[in-house]
């Protein structure tokens, strides 16, 4: 009887050992993340105006500020300081997406104290990042708006006319004083064809940075 018990205990012991070993080997595999076991959540849909008509979320703004142009004398020289001002008109197609067009004028910093004057036309796409992340809120006091667009400039320097164009990016910080009025600060950086400062360089392009401050007025409409 004692021999039979010993014979039975040995297989049972081996079964238990193999079971524990197999479970230990499978455990890490079960704990590993498997992306196929999960479904991604759909991104939130962009909000829309209930009854959108062209121009029913119109806004106008006036702005002025400083510009920094790359020095024509040297790549590493201190950028020259210029001025610009403008008027813009825009419309919001939804609480997130909008567009504006602008008429601009100012002067670039040129060599030897000869500053090229310019007038220009611009068009920008606007994305209300705050509304995209936190939904639309008509009484919100602070908004962050991304800007991407292009600009054409007609330049005049010492009796000579020329033109230039380029693309620019900006980030507007908007403070809403009331449902009708707002103030904003907007830093921008742009890459332009060579010659906005009246001088051609070996790099064949110019860059311009600016900091604009503006006041705006928006039209009220139904949401």
Language model: regions and residue ranges:
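Bacterial Sec-dependent N-terminal signal peptides
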Residues: 1-29
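N-terminal/domain-start segments enriched in small and hydrophobic, helix-friendly residues
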Residues: 33-38, 45-47, 135-146, 150, ...
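Residues that define the transmembrane beta-barrel architecture of outer-membrane proteins
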Residues: 56, 77-85, 115-121, 142, ...
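Residues on the lipid-exposed face of transmembrane beta-strands in outer-membrane beta-barrel proteins
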Residues: 62-66, 85-91, 123-129, 148-152, ...
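Gram-negative (and chloroplast) outer-membrane scaffold detector with strong preference
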Residues: 95-165, 177-179
């Amino acid at each position: 009887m004692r021999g039979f018990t010993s014979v039975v205990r040995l297989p049972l012991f081996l079964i238990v050992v193999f079971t524990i070993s197999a479970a230990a080997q499978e455990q890490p595999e079960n704990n590993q993340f498997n992306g196929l076991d999960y479904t991604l959540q759909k991104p939130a849909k962009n909000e829309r105006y209930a009854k959108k008509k062209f121009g029913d979320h119109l806004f106008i703004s006036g702005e002025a500020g400083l510009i920094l142009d790359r020095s024509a004398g040297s790549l590493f020289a201190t950028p020259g300081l210029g001025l610009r001002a403008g008027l813009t008109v825009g419309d919001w197609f939804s609480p997130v997406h909008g567009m504006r067009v602008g008429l601009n004028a100012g002067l670039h910093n040129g060599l030897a104290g000869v500053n090229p004057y310019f007038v220009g036309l611009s068009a920008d796409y606007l994305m209300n990042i705050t509304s995209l992340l936190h939904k639309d809120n008509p009484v919100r006091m602070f908004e962050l708006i991304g800007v991407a667009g292009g600009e054409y400039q007609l330049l005049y320097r010492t009796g000579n006319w020329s033109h230039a164009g380029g693309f620019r990016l900006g980030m507007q910080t908007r403070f809403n004083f009331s449902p009708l009025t707002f103030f904003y600060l907007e830093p921008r950086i742009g890459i332009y064809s060579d010659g906005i400062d009246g001088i051609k360089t070996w790099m064949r392009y110019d860059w311009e940075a600016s900091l604009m401050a503006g006041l705006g007025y928006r039209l009220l409409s139904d949401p």
